[in-house]
Amino acid sequence: MKISDAKFDIALANSGLTIGQAAERAGISRVRYAAILNQKRVTPQAAGKIAKGVGVTVEQIIETED
């Protein structure tokens, strides 16, 4: 599973939050949040934390395979 940079950026912009604020909402440190975003592949649990931070579903921020 990979988080789409473009989809995440849109979700973050729509939320009006900073990365630090999104990390706080997700219950993890800003450093850990950023590290997850920079990974090539993420676990479903990590994707869930990232999505929770910006208030969207996982489906809204992951890259889909066609």
Task: For the regions a language model picked out, list residue spans one by one.
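Recognition helix of helix-turn-helix/homeodomain-like DNA-binding domains
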Residues: 27-42
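Short C-terminal boundary/hinge segments that cap the last helix of small helical domains
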Residues: 55-66
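Short alpha-helical "recognition helix" segments of helix-turn-helix
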Residues: 21-23, 50
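A short, Lys/Arg-rich alpha-helix, primarily the initiator
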Residues: 1-21, 63
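Key DNA-contacting residues within the recognition helix of helix-turn-helix
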Residues: 9, 34-35, 48, 62
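Short, basic-rich loop-to-helix N-cap that marks the start of a DNA-contacting helix
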Residues: 39-52
